[in-house]
């Protein structure tokens, strides 16, 4: 199958930088977002009505959650869409599997391919793409997805979304531990720069200590570009999966609860690195 025409639904922070990469790779891209006017300079052909999404080889979703993906899919099915559907959103894997059963009956290929890396890596096409679904179907869209990053097969449908949630849980646990350690070190009288040099040369280093502490926390800029409410959503999904499937679950509920409480305290649309402000007050 030769893929030429690609629909992209959801052109927010991530979608708006991912879709232009597909254009640059030579595909015809048709974009739809109820909140955004697409710049003509992007090369994306804006679609104003979901009913116009016809005769496309692939349709990609980059939406807030799986429930919205399911609703949009229902609208597409009313138009007898036969495109390959790819959910690159951070959806609940259980919703993904449920939608997959519905689409399988209609003989529509459906994959989940959530991403990790944030806006900065999305801009340069270096996302980690976690692909779930039938391997033959993933092979069909491998070249297309590779335009946006490295494609890693995760497993059956829903596996990509499961790993995405679990990855963000592990990242969040490291974030809270790193913030707690930094605040404690400063209270003890240790300079932040000394703390970072030693932690990042020792076994405690992680993504937060290497990438976030100096640039966003110690600098007090708190502008990483990843909203706390998105982290809360992903960690909540992971916590729910862990409760359902794990024999022992000593940490996930505490991480999820702490992030949710921090979101309540921080107000409107905080960056996820602002959790440090909450933790600092209680250290």
Predicted regions and their residues:
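Internal alpha-helical scaffold of NAD(P)-dependent oxidoreductase catalytic cores
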Residues: 102, 128-160, 172-207, 245-247
């Amino acid at each position: 199958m030769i893929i030429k025409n690609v629909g992209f639904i959801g052109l927010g922070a991530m979608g708006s930088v991912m879709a232009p990469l597909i254009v640059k790779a030579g595909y015809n891209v048709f974009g739809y977002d109820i909140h955004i006017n697409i710049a003509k300079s992007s090369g994306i052909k804006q679609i104003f009505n979901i009913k116009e999404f016809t005769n496309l080889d692939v349709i990609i979703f980059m939406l807030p959650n799986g429930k919205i993906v399911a609703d949009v899919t229902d609208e597409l099915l009313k138009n007898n869409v036969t495109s390959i559907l790819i959910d690159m959103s951070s959806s609940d894997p259980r919703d993904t599997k449920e939608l997959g059963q519905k689409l399988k009956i209609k003989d529509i290929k459906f994959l989940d391919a959530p991403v990790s890396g944030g806006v900065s890596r999305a801009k340069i096409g270096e996302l980690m793409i976690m692909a779930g679904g039938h391997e033959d179907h993933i092979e069909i869209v491998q070249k297309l997805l590779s335009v946006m990053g490295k494609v890693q097969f995760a497993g059956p449908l829903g596996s990509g979304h499961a790993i995405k949630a679990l990855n963000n849980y592990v990242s969040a646990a490291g974030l809270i531990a790193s913030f707690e350690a930094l605040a404690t070190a400063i209270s003890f009288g240790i300079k932040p720069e000394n703390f970072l040099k030693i932690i990042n040369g020792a076994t405690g280093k992680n993504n937060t200590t290497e990438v976030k502490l100096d640039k966003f926390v110690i600098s007090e800029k708190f502008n990483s570009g990843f909203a706390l409410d998105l982290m809360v959503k992903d960690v909540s999904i992971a916590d729910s999966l862990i409760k359902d499937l794990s024999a022992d679950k000593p940490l996930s509920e505490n991480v999820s609860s702490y992030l949710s409480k921090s979101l309540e305290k921080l107000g409107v649309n905080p960056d996820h690195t602002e959790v440090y402000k909450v933790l600092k007050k209680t250290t």
